[in-house]
């Protein structure tokens, strides 16, 4: 059985439903969408397409490198499996690695990144960012994993390994109006981690690592994201502190609503064996 056949039945759909937000992991072969919560009933997914979403929040970006409907293994486009069509583009030699059910994009820590030419959400609160990430060298400073907005223009927010001049390997949360949160959670090089950040209604935040709540940060102002969304860097690169990831990314999900603990744990448990 070849890899394409294997992926066609392993990359199945999962719904983590609640009254306010739904995360959908699309099937590479399509299928029928689930039933939404109070927001209504989900539709029928097409090939690799999304199903329903519910309540006050929804998945606004979903990239899954192991899913051939999201990345077919060649080319410069990674396709968004949410309802919103926020496709991304691979810049400056981002590499694809076929790794069974845990395929990933490889970033060199110098100039590689994936760019989406829009802010996938303009929310300044009630946001979740979830990613499967593996840093090749956690001691490299300023490794931005995902950034929504323009850090150079001091807006938006993101998740990073280290900030400038820091080599601890700690996960940092960045609010673009010059606020860093040090979670104190150190990652190890060449180790896969499921990172999930909730920015709550008051702009305080909760950080989950591998399905466990590891850090909670206080509220702070956030300026509305502008310009774009980026994976593997932020646009704060014209100064002395470049923000490029040296490592691997396999999945990125952004939701315009926070996830419950049970939703985060369910997604972690449903995907962890791929890594």
What is the predicted role of each segment?
Residues 82-111, 121, 129-140, 158-221:
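Extracellular glycan-interaction surfaces
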Residues 151-153, 220-225:
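Short, surface-exposed loop/turn microsegments at beta-strand edges and helix-strand junctions
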Residues 2-111, 264-275:
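Extracytoplasmic low-complexity segments
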Residues 57-60, 69-74, 78, 110-172, ...:
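Extracellular glycan-recognition modules
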Residues 225-250, 254:
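Extracellular glycan-interaction patches encoded by glycine-rich segments
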Residues 62, 92-93, 194, 251, ...:
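Extracellular/lumenal ectodomain signal focusing on beta-strand-rich modules
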């Amino acid at each position: 059985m070849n890899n394409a056949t294997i992926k066609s039945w392993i990359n199945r759909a999962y719904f983590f439903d609640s009254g306010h937000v739904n995360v959908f992991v699309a099937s590479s072969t399509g299928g029928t969408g689930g039933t939404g919560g109070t927001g209504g009933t989900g539709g029928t997914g097409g090939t690799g397409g999304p199903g329903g979403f519910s309540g006050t929040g929804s998945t606004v970006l979903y990239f899954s490198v192991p899913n051939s409907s999201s990345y077919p293994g060649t080319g410069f486009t990674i396709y968004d499996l949410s309802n919103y069509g926020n496709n991304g583009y691979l810049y400056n030699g981002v590499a694809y690695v076929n790794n069974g059910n845990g395929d990933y994009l490889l970033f060199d820590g110098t100039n590689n990144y994936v760019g989406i030419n829009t802010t996938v959400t303009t929310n300044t609160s009630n946001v979740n960012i979830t990613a499967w990430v593996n840093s090749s060298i956690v001691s490299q400073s300023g490794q931005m994993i995902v950034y929504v907005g323009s850090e150079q223009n001091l807006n938006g927010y993101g998740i990073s390994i280290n900030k400038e001049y820091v080599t601890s390997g700690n996960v940092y949360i960045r609010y673009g109006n010059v606020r860093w949160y040090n979670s104190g959670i150190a990652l190890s090089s060449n180790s896969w981690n499921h990172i999930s950040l909730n920015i709550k209604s008051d702009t305080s935040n909760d950080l989950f690592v591998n399905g466990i709540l590891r850090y909670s940060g206080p509220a702070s102002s956030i300026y509305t994201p502008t310009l774009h969304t980026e994976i593997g860097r932020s646009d704060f690169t014209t100064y002395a502190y470049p923000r490029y990831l040296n490592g691997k990314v396999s999945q990125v999900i952004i939701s315009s609503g926070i996830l419950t603990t049970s939703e985060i744990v369910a997604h972690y448990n449903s995907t962890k064996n791929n890594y």
